Amino acid sequence: MLIVAYGNPLRSDDGLAWRVADALETKFPSGEVEILRLHQLTPELAEGVSQVDAVIFVDAASADTGERRPVEIRVEEIGSKDAGPSAVSRFSHHLTPRVVVALAAQLYGARARAFSATLTGQTFDHGDSLSAAIRHALPEFITRIEGLVRELQNPAGSVSRLIDQAVE
């Protein structure tokens, strides 16, 4: 199992994934779950994704598009249809979890279950502290991700009650 926590810890709420990674490291013994902290997703990550059964991408989302409510938690499965060749862009400076999963499938034949866990941030200004609303929501967000990890580790577990929707 791989957890990819990405964002910029020097841009306020954009660094929330790194805080999640810190919390999850205390909940899972070393070796049980691999946790990476990255500033952004890169094509090289596809190799690591190809070597696991499941990956969870953790990030701050922006409400700027109007599609998100402030401080909204979403945990979504990235569907298998997303892993086709059309998902891979020529431009690698702005990769999404879908593209990394698609690259893993295309280059390595990987079929890891993939999930996106996001929390809508409020401020992305320079700074290393989280907004009050995000600090308040963080424990619930961590609990949701921890529950997903535990269900994925249990062969008889069902993640359907833990995810908001399948993204196809």
Where are the regions a protein language model picked out?
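N-terminal catalytic or cofactor-binding beta/alpha core of small enzyme domains
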Residues: 1-119, 123, 128-139, 144-168
